[in-house]
Amino acid sequence: MFNKVTKSFQYGQHTVVLETGEIARQASGAVLVSVDDTVVLATVVAAKKAKPGQTFFPLTVDYIEKTYAAGRIPGGFFKREGKPSEKETLTSRLIDRPLRPLFPEGFYNEVQVVLHTVSVNPEIDPDIPAMIGASAALAISGIPFNGPIGAARVGYVDGQYVLNPTATQLKSSQMDLVVAGTENAVLMVESEAKQLSEDVMLGGVVYGHEQMQAAINAIHDLVRDAGKPDWEWQPEPKNEALIAAVTAAAQEKLVAAYQERQKQARTALLRNVYADVHAALAEQAAAAGQDAPDAVTVDNILFDLEARIVRGQILNGEPRIDGRDTRTVRPIEIRLGVLPRAHGSALFTRGETQALVVATLGTKQDEQIIDALMGEYRDRFMLHYNMPPFATGETGRIGVPKRREIGHGRLAKRALVSLLPAHEDFQYTIRLVSEITESNGSSSMASVCGGSLAMMDAGVPLQDHVAGVAMGLILDDGKFAVLTDILGDEDHLGDMDFKVAGTQNGITALQMDIKIQGITKEIMQVALAQAREGRLHILGKMREALEGSRGELSAFAPRMLTIKINPEKIRDVIGKGGATIRALTEETGTQIDISDDGTIVIASVDEAQAKEAQRRIVELTADVEVGQVYDGSVLRLLDFGAIVQVLPGRDGLLHISEIANYRIANINDVLKVGQQVRVKVIEADDKGRLRLSVKAIGGIEQQQAGGAEPAAQPESQAE
């Protein structure tokens, strides 16, 4: 019934198994990938024909995590998986990026790649198995695809590269790098690092590409034994006559339009050129008694012509679109403290790209709780990236963040996270929001720069400034040019887009997308060196604006006090049913977080209120010492004495014989409920019961006369 084909290969310390022919047989291609109990089902389906009028390649990649994979039932009312998590969205993008450039130009059939994580070992992230599975499913499907690709994760531990490190190994790794590519070329890199050099980062890319050949070879073996026949697909033949007509009508006008250095003016000129060409071609067709050429086809020819013009100018050493040479960073303007009530803010402008980045400090209660497949965890650092349509002078939908926004936010977060102070040194939760108010390329790197400045403006003690720069590459006939700080148009027209972020000491994040083959290690080396030059220039500008973190937090940020108590006293602070802690937070207006080890963090915008809460907690948890004198309050009267509270929650017996130096006939003659009285603890039994005395410090008559031994003060253990 089943024609099952299995291939396996060793991949670092893991064995990878590829299976096809048993599950999802009606898909164009389906492969089950297993790596040490992490199992991903990769499926591919492609439409046999493109939709009429289709003008772009409709590829969809969906990575889906099933909670049963971890032996769990989904939370929530419906107990069913819902909208994609951030992890699922980011992994979908990770898989999409190296696959998309490998489909042939002109192939507009709809293709859907779906990856289901159906079993998970917490030590093995499913993203690499999913990438390998997607590649294998496409390779055996017969769909036009210039693959397969391989993928690898690379760590860097004790000066050595580690292939596909486990989750435990990654905790001690200085690098978390994912690389994907074909046999001959790297196509995609995504990484974060702890201030590593360009050589170490590039070495990780090369190492990962070398090691992934094992995966590529296994996929070739799978195709040989289980591959379907290749589709009989040919691209539409080019209309050379139309290309010549468009070129003749538009070449000079496009060259002239690209002499305009200002984006909006240039865009207006280009729109006019497009309109003029369409009108001229329609007029020619009408004169010949023919229909006007397809508008989309003409637009595609014009775009290709634009690309040839811009790329040719740059490779010939002419100025770039905005007049710069290949190494110059656009003018930078920085303004700090832009928003008066925000905890920290920075307006970072680089040419026609601008980010308003805002830092907000919160408490442990503000941490993001993430219900991940691997288990629940908390995140104290969040970075949210928003790019509204007005940033590019357009109208559009505003609502749920799109995949691009989530991806850009994660890249900026990767760049900054390793520079954050240790949690024990700075216990605040940090949220950064990057509002892109103008965009003409490199907005994610503007978010990195603005994020570093906003946190320092908020008083977050970052280890160092972090800057990012987006680079581009144009390669043609053996000639190449690396472009520093690319514009949006240069991103679309170039062959490689890579973003590098880091400090003066090294790289903290690297993202690379390569659209063509033939980019060598040497070219990447030149590109990384030029990126370092640009990054150091930007860091210099940032230091001119703000040398380091401000010494004090914003007046509107919560103040935190930390005290340490005996863990056995936690119940005294919480009280029965949480009554004590609830009353304490409500009466002082503070937030109080209690850890199991007895660490208590008190947060309040009003420092005086925080100190009041601290004082009351110290009182609640103070130990009563025999021989110490305390200011007490009479709780109730007995025939033979009184019950006196010496500290919150601690009271003792004041016997009638220990009140005065004379005989008392009636307790009501000397004490009343609520009366303040100074007492000395003269005994505590093994059950914690206290015996008190007033007589031992002079008697009630002395206190009434105004003289008594001073009371003990509970010791604060504030850190």
From Swiss-Prot:
Catalysis: reaction(s): RNA(n+1) + phosphate = RNA(n) + a ribonucleoside 5'-diphosphate
KW Metal-binding (keyword) present: yes
Main location: cytoplasm
Cited SUPFAM superfamilies: Eukaryotic type KH-domain (KH-domain type I), Nucleic acid-binding proteins, Polynucleotide phosphorylase/guanosine pentaphosphate synthase (PNPase/GPSI), domain 3, Ribonuclease PH domain 2-like, Ribosomal protein S5 domain 2-like
Amino-acid positions noted as binding Mg(2+) in the UniProt annotation, renumbered to this chain: 491, 497
PROSITE patterns: KH_TYPE_1, S1
UniProt KW Lyase keyword: no
Gene Ontology molecular function, alphabetical: 3'-5'-RNA exonuclease activity; magnesium ion binding; polyribonucleotide nucleotidyltransferase activity; RNA binding
The protein's required cofactors: Mg(2+)
InterPro entries cross-referenced by the UniProt entry: ExoRNase_PH_dom1, ExoRNase_PH_dom2, ExoRNase_PH_dom2_sf, KH_dom, KH_dom_type_1, KH_dom_type_1_sf, NA-bd_OB-fold, PNPase
Cellular localization per UniProt: Cytoplasm
Top-rank EC class of the record's enzyme: transferase
Domain (KH): residue spans on this chain: 558-617
One GO BP: RNA processing
Enzyme Commission number: 2.7.7.8
Free-text function comment from the UniProt entry: Involved in mRNA degradation. Catalyzes the phosphorolysis of single-stranded polyribonucleotides processively in the 3'- to 5'-direction.
Family as reported in the entry's similarity comment: Belongs to the polyribonucleotide nucleotidyltransferase family.
Protein's UniProt name: Polyribonucleotide nucleotidyltransferase
Organism: Bordetella petrii (strain ATCC BAA-461 / DSM 12804 / CCUG 43448)
